[in-house]
């Protein structure tokens, strides 16, 4: 059964109308018995019960547009997998798309409309950490589960954590713990300059980086704060060069990374250790000739881990008609497994009740095989943040075969990259949350 994906720019009233009209048309066709295959499907519970609607929310324009597409593909693959075997609890899963934009106030409005007007069952996506914080706060008010697939501010698992939100990406603190420890060990001097994007994500990662630098015997000697629009990447790099330091810790996101590193001479990486908290495949593959320093990721399409080759083959078959992102990256991988975790929790509990699902997700553990990684993973019940393998990688440009440019240098288990402040997260009491059973 194909996923019904709706244009993200549609107003919510139209979106709800389209969902209703589409479903009524499907049921009418089944009732008329126009197709034998549809008649056979009509005998299954998924055809007679109301569909389970999940809203995929990710900014489809701006510096995260490609990330949003990759995230949606991962969610689609999981939904299609469950629908192929009859849906969930006898209900077809329908994925609808809505653009929350990169404006936090607008994102909150979109969440409110999806819940109160379109009556969706769950929200999934985000990409941008400010959007995730804004939308998940609204979801918490209504008791609607928010599955944060791919935003990586450490604050998502501490001050912006919620009982109804589960975060499936590693955060910048996890990546920077691995990267800064390595970089500081390679240099006799331990002076660090921070290059930070001036938004929730950047500031949260910079704050975590300061503590990590101090822990490993370094000192932060300066910080260059750049606007989100990154109007002058070369100017920002000149400011960094003016500071004497052995390590440069970069927390710049999305396509801004491409614009920044396009201005860097690769020889700079020999004189200094540069690290980037997280680099997604969507910032690498579109600019294969751009030099990159060390960075962190959670998965790569060419990992020699159980299940990876099969997942890549499914992806390439499913999206063979597209020119963009012919290979899946960490964003697609995270969204696929996050969506699968939600749907599996519904199957295991036999319910869509939010209280039951929260309890199930809080206790979930995954084997390394299930995660296509090197280590087992688990959902931290205190912070609702997935603890998983972190990979240290670099980019050796191969413009002729860009998919082969990424080189995995090593990996660390969850215990070695854990962000200690998550232990102090304060989630709302489950008993105080309204029940919601879509």
List PLM regions with ranges.
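Extracytosolic ligand-binding ectodomains
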Residues: 2-3, 15-17, 23, 35, ...
